[in-house]
């Protein structure tokens, strides 16, 4: 197996395209075997195999700083950075963490399971390197789902304003925990699903294959034409307006194409977005066909669990009181709201990865006479303490918080523990 010879990122450099394709398949097999046994996040990691390989071939980690937003999609990164042999112990006692861990490896810069933070880390690191004269590169990998979070927009705004040299890799699979809630994501979907653009791109590629004698001149012309066609349908106006160069979209499962895009991004001064289209659950039929989560988290909601009991109770309460509404921050399944949403779709609100907005929106609903129920993980609730304290508590509003995954949660490491809820919420 080729994978047996990959102990560190430098081992990727001597592989040809055929070997890289085989390696991708071997990594997917290891992911499926391990995650189906130990639990964890399968779909997101199956979708990022080629992108991760390309990142580690183009950049020199850990000298170049590769940062991962949320962190649940770093299994391939772990495999390629010296933890291949330990990977079968993922999320087990004395095994490796399900999220990045600074204790595990110098390749893991930030320990995180909270979304939308990576661009702020990137801005800070790039600022530090600039002041010290350090030439190392900063790369921030963020999903389209994480771009629904307000902190991500704050990071984009500051990167564009400062002009710091950061490569932002937008991993666009069209999904996070649930269908992505965002007007920006809707724009990205229009790019990935526009049939005219896709047909013309395919025809241009076929034309190039049929006339190899034209060579590099035709290739450059076709690239420019493809870019023009793309921009007719969805100009990268959003990023450009912030002062950030936009490149893409690119096929996230074509290693050569990704490597070329990343290499091009390095040549620009200032921040650059490299928009990469990937398929969540790639190469594993059960994950590809899981329309709810694409096997985001294989542990799921167990029969007889507190989450299941809450789910059933909320539906009953909703049936008896039409003023009861439910709010989730991009996690309707994990927090037990799918049954309520199916029964009362107009009374279930998914606000995207935006816990602060969820809480204050609930406050507004309560002011308007509704009885909002905010379903949220304990670890994510702490992101909205100010809103709970002032927007709900100070106004003495009838908002109910149903807090899941409280206490020491174990498998996914320190950033997923729910240890602060009681102390922060007590009077």
Description of each model-found segment:
Residues 84-100, 161-178, 196-199, 349, ...:
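A glycine-rich helix N-cap at a beta->alpha junction
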Residues 173-309:
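Long, well-ordered, tryptophan-enriched scaffold segments
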Residues 149-171, 181, 185-192, 371, ...:
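A short alpha/beta connector and helix-capping loop motif
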Residues 76-82, 123, 147-156, 178-183, ...:
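Short acidic, glycine/serine/threonine-rich loops at helix termini
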């Amino acid at each position: 197996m080729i994978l047996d010879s990959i102990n560190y990122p430098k081992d990727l450099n001597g592989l040809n395209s055929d070997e890289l394709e085989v390696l991708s398949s071997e990594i997917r097999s290891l992911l499926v075997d391990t995650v189906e046994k130990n639990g964890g996040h399968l779909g997101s990691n199956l979708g990022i195999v080629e992108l991760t390989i390309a990142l580690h071939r183009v950049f020199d980690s850990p000298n170049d700083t590769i940062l991962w937003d949320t962190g649940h999609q770093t299994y391939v990164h772990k495999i390629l950075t010296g933890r291949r042999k330990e990977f079968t112990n993922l999320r087990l006692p004395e095994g490796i963490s399900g999220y990045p861990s600074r204790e595990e490896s110098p390749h893991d810069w930030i320990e995180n399971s909270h979304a939308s933070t990576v661009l702020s880390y990137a801005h800070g690191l790039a600022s530090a390197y600039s002041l010290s004269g350090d030439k190392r590169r900063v790369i921030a990998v963020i999903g389209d789902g994480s771009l629904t979070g307000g902190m991500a927009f704050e990071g984009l705004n500051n990167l564009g304003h400062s002009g710091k040299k950061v490569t932002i890799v937008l991993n666009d699979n069209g999904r996070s925990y649930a269908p992505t809630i965002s007007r920006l994501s809707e724009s990205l979907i229009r790019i990935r699903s526009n049939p005219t653009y896709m047909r013309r791109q395919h025809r241009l590629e076929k034309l190039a294959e049929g006339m190899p004698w034209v060579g590099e001149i035709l290739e450059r012309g076709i690239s420019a034409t493809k870019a023009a066609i793309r921009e007719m349908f969805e100009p990268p106006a959003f990023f450009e307006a912030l002062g950030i160069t936009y490149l893409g979209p690119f096929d996230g499962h074509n290693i050569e194409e990704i490597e070329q895009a990343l290499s091009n991004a390095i040549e620009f001064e200032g921040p650059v977005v490299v928009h990469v289209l990937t398929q969540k659950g790639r190469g594993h039929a059960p994950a590809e066909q899981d329309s709810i989560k694409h096997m985001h988290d294989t542990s799921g909601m167990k029969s007889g669990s507190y989450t299941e009991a809450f789910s059933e109770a909320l539906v009953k309460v909703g049936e008896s009181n039409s003023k009861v509404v439910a709010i989730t921050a991009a996690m309707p399944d994990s927090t037990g709201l799918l049954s309520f949403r199916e029964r009362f779709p107009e009374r279930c609100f998914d606000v995207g990865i935006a816990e602060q907005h969820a809480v204050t929106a609930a406050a507004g609903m309560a002011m308007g006479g509704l009885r909002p129920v905010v379903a949220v993980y304990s670890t994510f609730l702490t992101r909205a303490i100010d809103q709970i304290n002032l927007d709900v508590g100070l106004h003495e509003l009838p908002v109910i918080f149903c807090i899941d995954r409280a206490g020491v949660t174990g498998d996914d490491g320190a950033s997923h523990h729910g240890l602060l809820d009681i102390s922060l919420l007590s009077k």
